[in-house]
From Swiss-Prot:
InterPro entries: 2-comp_sensor_kinase (IPR050351), HATPase_C_sf (IPR036890), His_kinase_dom (IPR005467), HisK_dim/P_dom (IPR003661), HisK_dim/P_sf (IPR036097), PAS (IPR000014), PAS-like_dom_sf (IPR035965), PAS_fold (IPR013767). One of its GO terms (biological process) is phosphate ion transport. Member of the two-component regulatory system PhoP/PhoR involved in the alkaline phosphatase genes regulation. PhoR may function as a membrane-associated protein kinase that phosphorylates PhoP in response to environmental signals. It comes from Bacillus subtilis (strain 168). Residues 29-150 are extracellular. It is found in: Cell membrane; Membrane raft. The gene is phoR. This is Alkaline phosphatase synthesis sensor protein PhoR.
């Protein structure tokens, strides 16, 4: 800004000097012309006056010479009297005179002869009775040098005064413009840095206010645009980072420039290890690399179901690859979306296994019933002993079939979203006492001691008594089933600060550690032969698990092969019994 002011000021100064020089030359010429005209008029009058004083008929008399000498001092001129032959008779400065001017005068050139050496010459003929008797020649110095000095002095003084005035107004004006322009420049600089809160404040010059208003309007518009873009970007990033599917973006050159959180979680990687790397170096799985190359080659959408190894497991991913095209069909890159289908595949497999198990479980009792019925129809009814045995088997298989159907109905009802519990506050000791009474006969038949251990003080839980009775009846019945003769089964109630633990412990055959995670699966049996002989359906523990989870409780299992198993159910504790 300062350099610009210096350049502008220099231009002003040069222009001003040129104007004053031209003006000075013009005035000088004007004054010189006017002064010369006045000098010519003045010397003409003096010459005519002097000629009127001279005695033209007798030029050599002493009176004429005295007049000429007196006139030289009085009129501040040099005067000479010349005869007709061009001889200088006398003069105010003696008999000296410019010979060229004398010759011109004698030749008939009267009036202003010339101006040389800053002198003005004027010649006039003298006549007596109509005859030319001589000449008078006057010369006077021009006084224009003093006038020129005064003129240029005035111009110089005017120039200095004008210079001071111009400098003052120029500095004042440019300072105001400078503040406005510098303010606008600073705002523009801040805007270029991304500081859209910068503003310029006017008031210096009205016209410059328009620039300030324009800059402020631009800043406001840029701020709004930036906020809108940031909001849209944040929304997009939020969506990208929080979608359940993994997402990767590859640019047109094959470099990965976006990896979302879901992908990093799915593949157990650090996103920074993949960013700004070529896809064939970043991806560990050849199937994904081949899919990307196919999209690059064909520029079409691809969708594949891939089974990829991740650490110690294999997971299924439905990978959608979509090419990104610009407005002019310009290739921008690829977006890969990884949908984790592992759970879906597991559910499909569970559904297949469930259908197969249900079919098998239903087929076994139906086959038995059909077989024994056909045997009876073929003539075995005549044998009373065989008839009684076959009918007992048919009854047993029918009861087993009924139990299976009932368990399937219970499991289906529990897994429905609209399944509800009849929650109330009750004392579990009474419910467990009823279970002990129901199963006491079975325990006595096998010679198993069944004990219920409850604290002396009443304890209350919040839950559905009917469903919880179903849970513990199943657990105690299983404990009796898998405990050999002479063993023991104990039901222990252990109150804690915020909940109550109810244990069902037996001294039975136990469960292998690798089988414990699977005992709550549908139709899974630890001892298949014993379970079938006892009439079990394989759905009891699956129902137990779902009912406990519906109560927001927890069930744990600890077991040692050959020494027994402990099922621990944790339920919410209630403060007091409801009225």
């Amino acid at each position: 800004m300062n350099k610009y002011r210096v350049r502008l000021f220099s231009v002003f100064v040069v222009c001003m000097i040129l104007v004053f020089c031209v003006l000075g030359l013009f005035l000088q010429q004007l004054f010189e012309t006017s002064d010369q005209r006045k000098a010519e008029e003045h010397i003409e009058k003096e010459a005519k006056y002097l000629a009127s004083l001279l005695d033209a008929g007798n030029l050599n008399n002493q009176a004429n010479e005295k007049i000429i000498k007196d006139a030289g001092g009085a009129l501040d001129v040099s005067a000479s009297v010349i005869d007709t032959d061009g001889k200088v008779l006398y003069g105010s400065n003696g008999r000296s005179a410019d010979s060229q001017k004398v010759q011109a005068l004698v030749s008939g050139h009267e009036g202003i002869l010339s101006t040389t050496d800053n002198k003005l010459y004027y010649g006039l003929s003298l006549r007596s009775e109509g005859e030319k008797t001589g000449y008078v020649l006057l010369s006077a110095s021009e006084k224009s040098d003093g006038l020129k000095g005064e003129l240029w002095g005035m111009l110089t003084a005017s120039l200095c005064t004008a210079f001071i005035v111009i400098v003052y107004f120029y500095s004042s004006m440019t300072s105001r413009y400078k503040r406005s322009i510098e303010s606008a420049t600073n705002v523009a600089t801040e805007l270029s840095k991304g500081n859209y809160d910068a503003r310029t404040y006017g008031g210096y010059i009205r016209r410059s206010d328009k620039l300030g208003h324009a800059m402020n309007s631009l800043a406001i518009d840029l701020m709004e645009m930036t906020r809108t873009q940031e909001m849209q970007r944040d929304r997009l990033l939020t969506v990208i980072e929080n979608i359940g599917s993994g997402l990767i973006m590859i640019d047109g050159r094959g470099f990965i420039n976006l990896v979302n959180r879901s992908y990093a979680k799915q593949f157990h990687i650090n996103p920074n290890h993949m960013l700004r790397r070529l896809y064939h170096d970043a991806f560990e799985h050849e199937e994904v690399i081949q899919l990307v190359e196919d999209i690059f080659m064909t520029e079409t959408k691809k969708c594949k179901l891939l089974r990829l190894p991740i650490k110690i497991e294999r997971r299924y991913f439905e990978v959608d690859g979509v090419p990104i095209m610009g407005p002019d069909d310009e290739w921008k890159g690829i977006v890969l979306v990884f949908h984790d289908m592992t759970e879906t595949k597991k559910l499909e497999q569970m559904r297949k296994d469930f259908v197969a198990n249900v079919s098998h479980e239903l087929k076994t009792p139906i086959t038995s019933i059909k077989g024994f019925t056909e045997t009876l129809l073929d003539g075995a009814m005549e044998d009373k002993e065989a008839l009684s045995e076959f009918l007992s088997i048919i009854l047993k298989e029918s009861e087993r079939l009924q139990s299976l159907v009932q368990d399937l109905l219970d499991l289906s009802k529990i897994e429905q979203q609209n399944f509800t519990l009849s929650i109330e506050t009750f004392e579990p000791a009474k419910m467990l006492g009823e279970i002990e009474t129901l199963l006491k006969h079975k325990a006595d038949e096998k010679g198993i001691s069944l004990h219920l251990n409850v604290p002396k003080d009443p304890q209350y839980v919040s839950g559905d008594p009917y469903r919880l009775k179903q849970v513990f009846l199943n657990l105690v019945n299983n404990a009796l089933t898998y405990t050999p003769e002479g063993g023991s089964v104990a039901i222990n109630v252990k109150p804690r600060e915020k909940d109550i633990q109810i244990e069902v412990a037996d001294s039975g055959i136990g469960i292998q550690k690798e089988e414990i995670p699977r005992i709550f699966e549908r139709f899974y049996r630890v001892d298949k032969d014993r379970s079938r002989n006892s009439g079990g359906t394989g759905l009891g523990l699956a129902i137990v698990k779902h009912l406990i989870e519906a109560h927001e409780g927890k069930i744990d299992v600890t077991s040692e092969l050959g020494r027994g198993t402990v099922f621990t159910v944790t339920l919410k504790r209630a403060a007091e019994k409801s009225a």
